[in-house]
Amino acid sequence: MAISRLLIENFRNLTAVDLEFDHGFNFLVGNNGSGKTSLLEAIFYLGHGRSFKSAVSNRIISYEQPHFILHAKIQEQAHQWSVGLQKLRQGNSVVKINGEDGNKIADLAHLLPMQLITPEGLTLLNGGPVYRRAFLDWGLFHHHNHFHLAWVNLNRLLKQRNAALQQATHYQALEIWDRELVKLAHQVSEWRAQYAEALRPEIEQTCRLFLPELEISVSFHQGWEKDSDYADLLVRHFERDRAIGYTVSGPQKADFRFKANGLPVEDVLSRGQLKLLMCALRLAQGEHLMKQKERHCIFLIDDFASELDQYKRALLAERLKQSGSQVFVSAITETQLKQMQPQQHRTFRVEEGCIAPL
């Protein structure tokens, strides 16, 4: 998958941008605040329907403009698509694929599998379980056709159950929710466990390359006691859940944990080591998608040189070259990118929201 052309209107300081990209490496060079991250953010938004910088769309739309528009030409093998997303200041979104209305953000996300590597991305390792569940669920979204619907229904049922807990005086009032909830919880947890196990060899192999001095291990935790029946657990924990006001145990509490030499990685690794591990995880997941589905991810890398020495930057660059993926990389100077100079690439200078090829 690759973006061949991108048009941007009124997205932060990018008021009018029309760019053609290389299917390999694309370098974005410019000072802090010039618009490099905004371009990566626009690409990410097109593939996710949300920003990785802000949850408030009005902060993304250019000042005094009613909306922003993102439009791209994308290619995968012999197939081509034209995709567009318009976000109104009132909050509404319009998604078009090949000129047709009525599409959803999930349709865009399926067309544009992306991996994001940013300095803030360390939350995957030192943040809460929600970030690691999202990591697993991203993979399942692209591997299992039925996962997204199951995930949506699971979250809907949990919200309904939590609302019912506020009014319930006895467990029987929740049985209507729990019969379906238990089925979906087992299905989603089984998919997550299978995916985590399938991904584990890829992660361990990539970690040996990036962090050979450490023994990295991974483990999946489903969100409730491993040997407990989830239906029985919901009955037994009714009074506790009712007192707290929400469902404490279940797939919404699942986690995917990482250890280095037997200890939690967030406790023992430096920031540089954490970034390398995060890069290894993103690369492993992208390579797993390629092996299983023959689909390339698009890699978005913000502030390439941050936290990495020259040798590690060269190592990451070589692994990205081998992946065959389209890659977008931002840096302050071209010197920071000298380890990443494949034959096929394009460099753009970014200055105060203006982007021009060099």
Swiss-Prot record:
Predominant location category: cytoplasm
UniProt-listed Gene3D superfamilies: P-loop containing nucleotide triphosphate hydrolases (3.40.50.300), RecF/RecN/SMC, N-terminal domain (1.20.1050.90)
Keywords of the record: ATP-binding, Cytoplasm, DNA damage, DNA repair, DNA replication, DNA-binding, Nucleotide-binding, SOS response
HAMAP family according to UniProt: RecF
Gene Ontology annotations of biological process type: DNA replication; DNA synthesis involved in DNA repair; double-strand break repair; SOS response
Naturally occurring in which organism (per UniProt): Pasteurella multocida (strain Pm70)
Source organism superkingdom: Bacteria
Keyword Zinc-finger annotated: no
Name of this chain's protein: DNA replication and repair protein RecF
GO CC terms, sorted: cytoplasm
